[in-house]
UniProtKB/Swiss-Prot annotation:
Keyword Transmembrane helix: yes
Compartments (UniProt record): Cell inner membrane
Any one Gene Ontology molecular-function term assigned to this protein's record: NADH dehydrogenase activity
Species: Chlorobium chlorochromatii (strain CaD3)
Protein task: NDH-1 shuttles electrons from NADH, via FMN and iron-sulfur (Fe-S) centers, to quinones in the respiratory chain. The immediate electron acceptor for the enzyme in this species is believed to be ubiquinone. Couples the redox reaction to proton translocation (for every two electrons transferred, four hydrogen ions are translocated across the cytoplasmic membrane), and thus conserves the redox energy in a proton gradient. This subunit may bind ubiquinone.
Regions crossing the membrane: 34-54, 106-126, 139-159, 178-198, 217-237, 278-298, 313-333, 352-372
GO CC annotation, single: plasma membrane
Keywords: Cell inner membrane, Cell membrane, Membrane, NAD, Quinone, Translocase, Transmembrane, Transmembrane helix, Ubiquinone
EC category name: translocase
Protein name, as recorded: NADH-quinone oxidoreductase subunit H
Substrates-to-products reaction catalysed: a quinone + NADH + 5 H(+)(in) = a quinol + NAD(+) + 4 H(+)(out)
Length: 372
């Protein structure tokens, strides 16, 4: 689908379904309080989607870990142990919330909150389906990357506020790692934005739609897209502190990293924020390179597979499944690859990924200029 077709046909159809469009339409003839209230009510499903992804990411981690080790994992609480995570939340709610006497109480308390807010706010710009988009921003991709990077503030507050040398070491490692890997990750995403000609995640998704299914996805349209795709996926592992980049939480060196001193629900919030970041980076890579809500199935003759598997409900299904696939790969790698050393981590970022990211940026620009 061309940019002209997008502006003439698709945008009026899709933009009218976003939550902020509903608010703008109501603001013209109602008091300001009603649109705000309706917007909050309409955002409730977004809250449930985010909490569902965060909560059952823990369950998925346990089951996948058990599968890798030829175990069963949680089985007792609910069918197949599906309520185990809820039981753990109830347990953590009853635990004592301990604040070390020597800790900076303000920083110690706000650290987990900043982490969780950073993970949750990024969900607002994710286009889950043609009929459900929290906010369609013309800089949506930039917003998502920036909000996810907000975790640096929470991590540093948690590590410094704990007044514990292991927590501080873990926080410094994590901040250095995240800030470093933001560079190749951002350049890789710019390659996707260059192919689409926009930073609006909704438009990026629409431009990858078509009856040929996966053939319209940028990963298959442009052979160069495989390079930024792999660069962003590797960098996203480092940004989410997943193996083999889980150096900030190295148990044998730092006990538990920057959240060593946390207990009760503060510990749970930090844990949930990590799974929120995992889903967020997985959703971003699905939107930019794999068509987001678009069905990968093509229309083949009389079998209109793409037509049958498109729409609001199917759109949400596809983007969630694509996101869960990358989450599965992240969990799989945890039990496959050994942890890197700090020097190896930085070498990979500055000497390998960053140069290749610049190369992919130049190649993508040349492809967009000279290949019709």
């Amino acid at each position: 689908m061309t940019v002209t077709a997008l502006s003439q046909l698709s945008l009026p159809l899709f933009m009218g379904t976003t939550l902020n469009a509903w608010s703008d339409a109501l603001a013209g003839f109602t008091p300001w309080g009603l649109p705000v209230g309706l917007l909050i009510i309409a955002a409730i499903p977004l809250v449930f989607i985010a909490l569902y992804a965060l909560t059952y990411g823990v369950y998925g981690e346990r089951k996948i870990s058990a599968f890798m080790q030829d175990r069963l994992g949680p089985m007792e609480v609910g069918k197949w142990g599906i309520l185990q995570t809820l039981a753990d939340i109830l347990k953590l709610l009853q635990k004592e919330d301990i604040v070390p006497l020597s800790a900076d109480k303000f920083l110690f308390v706000i650290g987990p909150g900043v982490l969780f807010v950073g993970s949750f706010l990024a969900f607002a710009v994710l286009p889950f389906s043609p009929a459900f988009i929290g906010a369609s921003l013309n800089v949506g991709l930039f917003y998502a990357v920036g909000i996810v990077a907000l975790e640096v503030v929470g991590i540093l507050a948690a590590g410094w506020g704990s007044n514990n040398k292991w927590s501080l070491y873990g926080a410094v490692r994590s901040v250095a790692q995240i800030v470093s890997y933001e560079i190749p990750a951002s350049i890789a995403l710019l390659c996707g934005a260059m192919m689409a000609g926009t930073l609006d995640m909704q438009k990026i998704t629409i431009l990858q739609s078509g009856e040929l299914g996966f053939a319209h996805f940028y990963l298959f349209q442009n052979p160069i897209a495989w390079l930024p795709f792999l660069i962003y996926f590797i960098a996203s592992l480092a940004e989410t502190n997943r193996a083999p980049f889980d150096i900030p939480e190295a148990e044998s060196e730092l006990v538990a990293g920057y959240f060593t001193e946390y207990s009760g629900m503060k510990f749970a919030v930090i844990f949930l924020a990590e799974y929120g970041r995992m889903f967020m980076v997985s959703a971003i890579i699905s939107i930019v390179f794999l068509g987001g809500w678009n069905s990968p199935l093509p229309n083949i003759g009389a079998f209109e597979l793409n037509t049958w598997t498109s729409g609001a409900v199917w759109g949400a299904f596809w983007i969630i499944m694509k996101g869960f696939f990358f989450i599965f790969v992240q969990m799989w790698l945890r039990w496959t690859l050994p942890r890197l050393r700090v020097d190896q981590l930085m070498y990979l970022c500055w000497k390998v990924l960053t140069p290749f990211a610049f190369v992919s940026f130049v190649l993508t620009a040349l492809w967009e200029i000279y290949v019709p």
